[in-house]
């Protein structure tokens, strides 16, 4: 899943839709920091995920 865009992982999820982050395939320092300050169940938007992680992290999530 490395390099997969967030919007590629779940058909029907559009930028700005709420998603729940379950697991990160690859870690970056920024992502690791956010995991420490936010629980896994933190509700983010796909736009925010793209800003924070770009293409460096592939995320598995489920639509809320």
From Swiss-Prot:
Belongs to the class-I aminoacyl-tRNA synthetase family. Keywords: Aminoacyl-tRNA synthetase, ATP-binding, Ligase, Nucleotide-binding, Protein biosynthesis. Transmembrane segments: none annotated. Its EC number is 6.1.1.5. It is an enzyme of class 6 (ligase). Member of a complex that includes annexin. One of its GO terms (molecular function) is ATP binding. It catalyses: tRNA(Ile) + L-isoleucine + ATP = L-isoleucyl-tRNA(Ile) + AMP + diphosphate. GO terms for biological process: translation. The keyword Ligase applies. This is Putative isoleucine--tRNA ligase.
